[in-house]
Swiss-Prot record:
Sequence intervals crossing the membrane: none
HAMAP family (alphabetical): UPF0312 (MF_00780)
A GO CC annotation given for this chain: periplasmic space
Superkingdom of origin organism: Bacteria
Entry protein name: UPF0312 protein Shew185_3055
Similarity comment: family membership: Belongs to the UPF0312 family. Type 1 subfamily.
Location, primary (coarse class): periplasm
Any one Pfam family match given in the protein's UniProt record, by short name: YceI
Length: 191
């Protein structure tokens, strides 16, 4: 009996640190389970909507301690796609993303605030067009669990808005078109 109790205690003590630590995930972009879309007002009458087709990233997350989460994302800005070839060419130009000089945008989290019920604020630094500025993403933990293929997944949504001029984008599209709204869908596969 003592031997069984000792074995159980040793086993529990070995598993306890694993249960309390954050898991690392890679963003499942290839399975089309993640997206980065944007929306910009078009003259105050409508919206131009687009996406970035090529990005990668990873995150660590523990539902028991969400404030310890970390996020890193790299976006290939050349992959911008607004479903209009001429407009995409203009977005890639020095008027906007200047992709010939800055082919990548990055986001690296610095802190995470737990707002309760799966709601988070992910604070970090966005580097876009060669400029790095703080950015807060309002996020929500959608869920996590086993997938049918023997893996483990965690999913989140997020939104944020930023002023183009803050990132050195000086093209004046009028006051109704000065901000970009980002919508994020992230599903990660545990490493």
């Amino acid at each position: 009996m003592k031997k069984q109790l000792l074995s159980a205690l040793i086993g529990a003590s070995l598993l306890a640190p694993m249960a309390a630590s954050a898991a690392d995930y890679v963003i499942d972009r290839e399975g089309a389970h993640a997206s980065i879309t944007f929306k910009v007002s078009h003259l105050g009458y409508s919206y131009v909507v687009g996406r970035f087709n090529d990005f990668s990233g990873d995150f660590s997350y523990d539902a028991a301690k969400p404030t310890a989460a970390k996020v890193n994302v790299t976006v290939n800005t050349l992959s911008v796609d607004s479903n209009h070839a001429e407009r995409d060419k203009h977005i890639r130009s020095a008027d906007f993303l200047n992709t010939s000089k800055f082919a990548q945008a990055t986001f690296t989290s610095t802190t995470v605030e737990d707002k309760g019920n799966g709601d988070l604020v992910i604070n970090g630094n966005l580097t876009l067009n060669g400029v790095t500025k703080p950015l807060a993403i309002n996020a929500h933990a959608v869920g996590e669990g086993q997938d049918p293929w023997g893996g483990y997944r965690a999913g989140f949504t997020g939104t944020t808005t930023f002023a183009m001029k803050d990132f050195g984008i000086k093209m004046d599209l009028g006051p109704a078109s000065s901000h970009v709204e980002l919508d994020l869908v992230v599903e990660g596969v545990r490493k």
